[in-house]
Amino acid sequence: MSFTRRQMLKGLTGLVVVGLGAGGAARYWLGKVEDDNAGHDYELIAAPLDVELVPGHTTQAWAFGPSAPGTELRVRQGTWLRVRFINHLPIETTIHWHGIRLPLEMDGVPYVSQLPVKPGEYFDYKFRVPDAGSYWYHPHVSSSEELGRGLVGPLIVEEREPTGFKHERTLNLKTWHVDEQGGWMPFSVPREAARNGTAGRLITINGQADAVTELPAGQVVRVRLLNLDNTWTYRINLKGNCEARIYALDGNPVTPRPLEDDYWLGPGMRICLAIRIPEAGEEISLRDGFVRLGTLRAVANPDAPSDWPAALPPNPIAEPDLQNAEKLNFNSEWAGKVSVGTDQGKPPSLWQINGQAWDITDKTCADRPIATLTKGKSYIFELKNMTQYQHPIHLHGMSFKVIGSNRHDIKEPWFTDTYLLGKNERAQVALVADNPGTWMFHCHVIDHMETGLMAAIAVV
C-alpha cells in the first residue's frame, strides 16, 4: 500500500535526519565501521563528486563513495549486509539492491517500501543476502538523472566456500550523457524514450574511457561484467588470443560453456566470465559488437598456469512446479500516442503493460497491482514484446527461471532477475511466489520505465 510521510516515520526506524556535515572527513567515504555498537557495517554516502570523464574537463557527477560508478561492496553469501546510507545530495533518493531477494522494506522503492531519503537524512539498510553472484545498487528516484549522473555501484556476494578462482576483476560498463567538454546532455528525450531509449555518448569501464585492465598471464581469471547503463545493450565479445567461458548470468550459476557469438547484455544485466589470459604482453579487446570498449592486458605473473574451475554452486532458489503453475500474460506495448507532460514534471506516457501505463508521479500506483500472486504458488509468466524495441524486463524481490522463447533455443533454463525481451519476442519465465510484498516489475531501459513500462506485482 502507499502511505504518507507521517505514517512512514511512525512505522520505520531506519530514516533519520542528520546534519549535512555528518561524516566529517568521510564525506565521500565508503568503509568498514569498526564500532561493534554502531548497528551497521558500512557507511555509504551519496554526494556530488567532480570526475574527469573527458580528458582535461571536469564533470559534476553524483556518486556513492569516492568514485563513479560507486565503490564495490562485498559481502559473503548467507550473512547480513548492514549499510548506513547518508544523503548529501541536493535531492531525495533511495538505494535499490538490484537482483537481491530481500524483505520489501529494504527494497528502496519510494512510497512502496520506504520514504525517499531527503537531503540531510540517513537510512539504515539491513538484510541477509541469500544468493552469491554479481549484483548492483542504484536509486529508484528520479532514475534517469540519478543513475545518469553516476549513482550506480557493484555489489558482489561471495560464495560460502572457495570457488577455485584465484583471480577476479569487476568491470562496470556505463555510457555517460556528456558532450566533448564533459558537460551534461539530456538524460531522457521523449523522441528517444519512445524508441530504444536516450543513449549516452561516452563509453567507460569503471568510469574510464579507453580503459586498460591488467590481468595475470597464464591464469584463468573470473571477470564480472556489469551493465550499469541507463539504456545501452552491449553485444559482448572478446577479440584476441584467449578462451572464455560463461560461468554465471545475472548472479546465477550456469553450466560453464564457451563465450562464442555476441552475448547481449542489457541494462541491469550481468555476466560472469572465466578468461584464460595469454602470455605477458598480449592484449585482448573487450568489444561491443565491433566497437572496442577497453583492453585486457596480460602482465607477468609468477604463479603456475591455472586450470578451469568447476561449475559454481547453485543458489538456493525454489524450483517452480511447472506442471501445476498458473499462467499469466504480460504484454509490453506502445501506448499508441505521445501524451504531453504536465508542468509538475510528469513525463509523457509512451509505454504500457497490459494496457496500463505507470505514472511515476502518482504515489498510489502500487495500490493497483497488475497481478496478485498467492504466496508459495508457482507461476509461468508469458512475456510478450509487442513493439519493435527490446526491453530488459526486471522483477524486484524474486528470481524467475527462463524456460522458453520463440526467438531463442533455451537448452538450459536459468534463473535470473532481468531478461532481455527482444523485439516481437514471446518468452516464458517461471517462479515461485515466495516473497510477500508489492514488487516492481519493469523495463530497465530507464526512460522506458519512467514513461510507463512498469507495474506492481503483489504477493499475498
PLM features: residue spans?
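N-terminal secretory signal peptides and thylakoid transit peptides that target proteins
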Residues: 1-16
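Extended terminal and domain-junction accessory segments
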Residues: 11, 19-43, 147-179, 255-390, ...
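N-terminal edge beta-strand
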Residues: 56-74, 201-211, 349-375
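Extracytoplasmic beta-sandwich strand-turn segments characteristic of Greek-key/jelly-roll folds
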Residues: 68, 73-75, 99-131, 246-279, ...
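Asparagine-centered strand-capping/turn motif at beta-strand->loop junctions
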Residues: 85-89, 226-227, 383-387
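Histidine- and aromatic-rich segments of cupredoxin/plastocyanin-like copper-binding domains
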Residues: 106-107, 115-118, 186-324, 407-410
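Active/binding-pocket-proximal capping segment
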Residues: 240-251, 386-414, 446-450, 458-460
